[in-house]
């Protein structure tokens, strides 16, 4: 039996994140326009920007999937035909859709554009997938609450021509496949229209009815608990299991995350998938450096979601609230020549610091800052100015644009 070659599907919140995803090996990217997407926080793409983004992606052999996955009311539907026609004209490779009314409009106003069913739809069984296939969908993004065995059951009952996509990395909602109303109730921001204020991440206390003004923290440990704040998902060490279940597209969450996040996570999963395909086996594990990469971004503690059964206690609920930030971008490479590296500073670093240079598809390069100089050629003991250029000795050949990072644990 042929082994599935899974697609690495990366987020692209703006043009810079699009370039990062493509450079670091994404097979496809997903992005939003200025309307009808579930992420209002990223810059997203205007109609003209979308056309340019699609052209750039296609020049590099990368597909573009456009989000159209809000749950619109009747008034919003009136604006949809123009949006769909513009998306079709831009040449997007698929529309990601939640609502059946939007699907109907897509078949009418963008009939040549493939339809992918969003995880928001909550597809958890093959009958739903077959019905959506009959309505014209070519791919489903599975409900996030499924185990690997349930994914395999879903895949086996789906039409063979239909593809199965699954989130494998990133933030998770404590709601059914992302359908949540907390934001609507508490901040009047519509979570199913791209405006979620993430109240599940807030710190909550209890108040007893007769003791007004006396607040009691909801505690699990001495540091308390954020009762609805889930860990982040990470499945980089379980690629054989995902492929065996029939998943043909590995989706990375994070359109609102940074360019650095996009680059690192895309690079890690691209490298891990390629390593597996080069020597497939049931006991495959990615190289240590590939796993380490996903710990060098801002992240919450990791878990495997529902893939291996319903989460229990510390497997899912997160007790600290904030992000883990043990690495930061120190600089971006500008040019490398004659044993000297020129960089553009992003965070302060010092003479003698050990820095890592992120490499595409291979282990990072560790260097020590020696002979640090400012743009005037003067020797300095640190690089304090954001965006300013500095040079230091470096024998390695470093491509322009490479991320150079520093462990904050060593400060």
Task: Report each predicted region and the residues it spans.
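Surface-exposed amphipathic alpha-helical tracts and adjacent flexible/coil segments at the periphery
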Residues: 1-23, 28-31, 35, 60-70, ...
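Active-site beta->alpha loop and helix N-cap motifs at the rims of alpha/beta catalytic domains
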Residues: 2, 14-17, 35-126
